[in-house]
Structures are given as C-alpha cells and as structure tokens.
Amino acid sequence: SLLTNRYEAELELLVFASWHGTEIVSIPIQVYYPPRKERISHFRPGMDFARISLLNTLLCVLAIIYGLPCRLYRKMVTFLRTAYSLLFFLFFMMVIITPLAWLYIKIGRMTEKKQVRLHELIYHAARFVMIHHGIPGTKFIRKVGGMIIKGKEPVRFDFDKPRIIICNHQSHLDLMCQLVFTPKIVFLTNQWVWNNPTYGFLIRHAEYLPVIEGLEPLMPQLRSLTDRGYSIAVYPEGTRSKDCRIGRFHQGAFYLSQELGLEILPMYLYGPGKILPKKTYHLRKGIFYIEVGNPISRKE
C-alpha cells in the first residue's frame, strides 16, 4: 500500500514504539552490498517522494494529537508512581519502623534475643514492601530450587546455615529484594549507606558493617556473626551497574569464604536496574526477578 512499503513500514513501527515508551536498541548487523554494476535500482522519484511526504505529514499530525498526549501521560504516571513510592517509603521508615526500632533498642539492654527480633523486624518490613504491598507498576518474582515463586508462597530452602551470599548489584532496591528470604542475613555496605539519614540508624544496630579500610579490621565481627548463624551478603562488583551488565568481581567474597570456611550462595538479580537505574530518581514499570542458585563449596 501507499504507506506500508519497505522503509516506510519500518519508520512507522519505530515511531509508534517510541510513542508508547518502548526501548529501542540498536544492533549492528553486517550487510552485503553487491558491486555497483550489479545493483538494480527500484527508485521511482515521483511516487517515492509523494509517499514519503504523505507519510511524514501524517506522522507529524499524529505526533501532535496522539504521540504527545501519550508521552505526557507516561511522564505523569511515572511522576505519580515515584512520588507515591517515595512518600510511602519515608512514612513507613521514618514514622513506623525507625521509631519502633529506636524504642525497642533503647528500652533495656541489647541481648541476642533482641538482636534476632530486630533482624526479624527488618525482614518483615522488606516482605511487606516487596511482596504484600509491592511497588506500583512492578511485579516481584523469586526463583528458588528451580521453582518460580510468586506472591506470598513459602520458600523451601534452608537459609539457616551461614554462608557468604554474593549477588550482582544494579540498584538501591537490590537489598530489599534479598531481605525477603531470611532475617539471618547481614550486609557489607559502603559508608554512604551506613550513614544514611533515613535507615542508617536501623542498619547500624542490625550489625551491617561498612567496608572502609578493607576486610581485615572486620574479621572478628564477621566471625562472631557467622558463629551466631548469620550469612554475610556481599556485592562483589563493589558498585551498581550502569547498564545492568555484570562487572568485574573483586576478591573479597572469595577471601571471606576461605577465611570463614563457608559456602558461597549465589543470587542473580534482574530488573531493579531497569526499574530504578543508577543515577536516576524516577521509578519505571518492570519486573523484579531474583534467583537463588545452588551453594558453591570451598573446593569448587
């Protein structure tokens, strides 16, 4: 037809995809061009110019009456999703969780039983945010032991045995994804997270440890934690990925495995880096997917 030949059909597809927020990825391919003498031209100046002019005019009109409203609607929905999630998180942390934790910590002395209950509070808070309430526009999917788990289904995996947990790092939301599995987990963080004004108080008293001057100064505390049954979670890349690709691993996690005599439990994350990419501040629609792999022994 007049508007769906060759180049025009591809252009229409790209334009409509961009209006609906579909990510367009460029994939270079090798194309064979025959020698000039062997080429056959199908160019028809009058018909081709008429078709291109008509198509561009139509697309410009549609861009104003259809494409622009679509774009504005998506921006408004993204803003509302981000604003709601941010306000919910601030209210949940600053008005409910942190005051409860502060009272619980300050009343009486800190015992091992109180420490366990503090970790259980963090665990249930993460499950409420990620599973029961959820982040608007997203789904949370877990895969454990080869089984896909959706919603509130129980996880059949032994998380009570202390291990070194490693995971790729994509977003600020990664930690929440991992916390839904067990309360017996402690994270190694950077100084910014440890001093965060929103949840820093909570993670400091939950015995999360900042890696500032290497792992050696932390070894006594890490041994104490694993002796008490806690797993140590590490992001071997050391920083969030900009494009969701897995970066080079540092040796810290493997050093801890050797020194503490623990298995390594790999977890694989996909989605947080698409929903809240590095250096962005708005939440996109998407799927949180986290998979728990098979434990890796020290020999392996």
What is the predicted function of each stretch?
Residues Q30-Y32, T198-G200, D227-A233, K242-K299:
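A cross-family acyltransferase "interaction/gating" segment
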Residues G151, L209-E213, R298:
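Short acidic-hydrophobic, aromatic-tinged amphipathic segments that line or gate anion-handling sites
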Residues L72-R163:
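Membrane-anchoring hydrophobic helices of lipid-metabolizing enzymes
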Residues C60-P69, L225-R228, N294-E300:
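A charged, well-structured terminal subsegment
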Residues A101-F128, D158-G214:
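Catalytic core of membrane glycerolipid acyltransferases/transacylases, capturing the structured
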Residues L2-R81:
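Hydrophobic helical membrane-anchoring modules
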Residues I24, I148-I149, P210, I232, ...:
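Hydrophobic beta-strand scaffold residues
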Residues F16-A17, C177-Q178, L202, Y255-E259:
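Hydrophobic/aromatic ligand-binding patch that stacks against planar heteroaromatic rings
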